[in-house]
């Protein structure tokens, strides 16, 4: 009998408390779950080429999530934007269209190392220029990335 890999991380949205972002061990797919409708992912976020290590929702942008992975990428996901929908590569089954629940990233940043962790900077008088910042750790370094 084959078992699904264990969930590795879970992040609750600060703006939509019924939404959770999660990924499994050794997975490159983030799943967005609605706790009011358990059992099926609302969205799948695909864009990483290697195992994901971290996810975090933006504290200031509703529906925005950042992720980091072993592919050395930080990806930004905008769940509210329809322009990030990916045409499913899965063929139609019995003439029915494939589900439209896959999204691609809206922005990316290449790190010099595998991304171990990340965190959104809270807004303050030090960064009130309108931009968002993400702290990224990889290898033995830490970077500040402005969006």
Predicted segment positions?
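Canonical WD40 repeat/beta-propeller blade segments in eukaryotic WD-repeat proteins
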Residues: 1-18, 50-57, 112-126
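Blade-level signature of beta-propeller repeat domains, shared across WD40, Kelch, NHL, RCC1
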Residues: 119-147
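Structural hallmark of WD40 beta-propellers
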Residues: 9, 16-22, 30-31, 40-43, ...
């Amino acid at each position: 009998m084959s078992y699904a890999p264990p969930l590795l991380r879970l992040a609750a949205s600060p703006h939509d408390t019924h939404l959770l972002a999660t990924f499994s061990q050794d997975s490159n797919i983030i799943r967005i779950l609605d706790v009011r409708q358990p059992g099926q992912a609302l969205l799948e976020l695909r864009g990483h080429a290697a195992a994901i290590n971290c996810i975090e929702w933006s504290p200031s942008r509703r529906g925005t999530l950042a992720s980091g992975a072993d592919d050395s990428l930080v990806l930004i996901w905008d769940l509210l934007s329809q322009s990030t929908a990916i045409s499913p590569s899965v063929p139609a089954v019995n003439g029915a269209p494939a589900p439209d629940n896959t999204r691609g990233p809206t922005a990316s940043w290449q790190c010099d190392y595998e991304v171990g962790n990340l965190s959104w900077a809270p807004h303050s008088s030090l960064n009130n220029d309108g931009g968002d910042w993400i702290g990224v750790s990889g290898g033995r370094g830490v970077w500040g990335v402005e969006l």
